[in-house]
C-alpha cells in the first residue's frame, strides 16, 4: 500500500495495493485528516498488533498525527480502517520523522527533526496492543536547521543511532544511542563537517 502526505490539503492519502503478478494497480485513495501541512510520514507497527500504522509530521501544526490501523485482512479499505488519530505535541516546524525501537524494549519509538529548531526529538513508545501512546519527548541539540534525519546502527552495538543534516552549517550531527530498556538517551552530538 502507499501513504502520501498532502501538504496543502491537511490530509494523508492511503492507496490500497491491488496489484497482481506483472500488473501494478491501486484502489481509489482514502483520505485521512491530519494537522496543519503534513510533510513526511513513517509507517511501522506502533502498537505491536501486527498491523502497520503511520505517523505524520505536521509542519505548521507543530505536531505528529498517529493513525492506528484497525483494518482486517483482505477487507475493503475505508475511512474506518484507521482509528481517530492520536496527536503528539512537537516543537515548531517538524520536518523529517523516523520510527525505530531506540530503547530496545520491543516497542517502536519516533524521532523527528525540525526546520526552525536546532533539536531532534525522540518520543518513547508506551503503547499496549490496540492502544497507541507515547511519553513526553526528549530533545537533543543539533546544529543549525537540522532538516533531514537518518537512523541506523552506526557503531555495531545493535542500537539504532541518529544522524541529522544541518542545512545552515553544512554539517551532520551524529547521536550515539546510549539507551536502556524503558529509557531513551543519546550521547552529545558528534559534528561532521
Map each language-model feature to its residues.
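Hydrophobic beta-strand segments that make up the repeating blades of beta-propeller
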Residues: 1-5, 54-58, 110-113, 162-165
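Calcium-coordinating acidic loop motifs
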Residues: 18-20, 45-51, 59, 70-72, ...
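Short, solvent-exposed loop/turn segments at conserved positions within beta-propeller repeat blades
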Residues: 7-10, 59-60, 115-118, 167-168
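Generic short N-terminal amphipathic or hydrophobic helices
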Residues: 11, 23, 63-65, 96, ...
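A short loop-to-beta-strand structural motif that recurs across blades of beta-propeller domains
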Residues: 11-15, 63-67, 119-123, 171-174
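Blade-edge motifs of beta-propeller repeat domains
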Residues: 16-36, 68-92, 124-144, 176-193
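Beta-propeller blade termini
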Residues: 30, 39-48, 86, 95-104, ...
Amino acid at each position: 500500500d502507499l501513504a502520501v502526505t498532502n501538504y496543502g490539503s491537511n490530509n494523508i492519502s492511503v492507496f490500497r495495493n491491488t496489484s497482481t503478478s506483472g500488473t501494478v494497480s491501486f484502489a481509489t485513495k482514502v483520505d485521512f485528516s491530519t494537522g496543519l501541512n503534513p510533510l513526511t510520514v513513517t509507517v511501522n507497527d506502533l502498537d505491536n498488533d501486527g498491523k502497520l500504522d503511520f505517523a505524520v509530521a505536521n509542519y505548521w501544526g507543530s505536531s505528529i498525527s498517529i493513525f492506528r490501523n484497525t483494518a482486517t485482512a483482505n477487507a475493503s479499505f475505508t475511512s474506518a480502517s484507521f482509528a481517530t488519530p492520536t496527536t503528539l505535541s512537537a516543537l515548531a516546524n517538524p520536518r523529517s520523522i523516523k520510527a525505530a525501537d531506540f530503547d530496545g524494549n520491543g516497542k517502536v519509538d519516533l524521532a523527528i527533526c525540525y526546520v526552525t529548531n536546532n533539536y531532534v526529538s525522540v518520543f518513547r513508545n508506551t503503547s499496549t496492543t490496540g492502544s497507541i501512546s507515547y511519553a513526553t519527548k526528549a530533545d537533543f541539540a543539533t546544529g543549525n536547521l537540522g532538516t533531514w534525519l537518518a537512523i541506523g546502527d552506526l557503531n555495531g552495538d545493535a542500537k539504532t543511532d541518529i544522524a541529522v543534516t544541518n542545512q545552515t552549517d553544512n554539517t551532520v550531527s551524529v547521536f550515539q544511542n546510549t539507551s536502556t530498556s524503558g529509557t531513551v538517551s543519546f550521547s552529545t552530538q558528534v559534528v561532521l563537517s
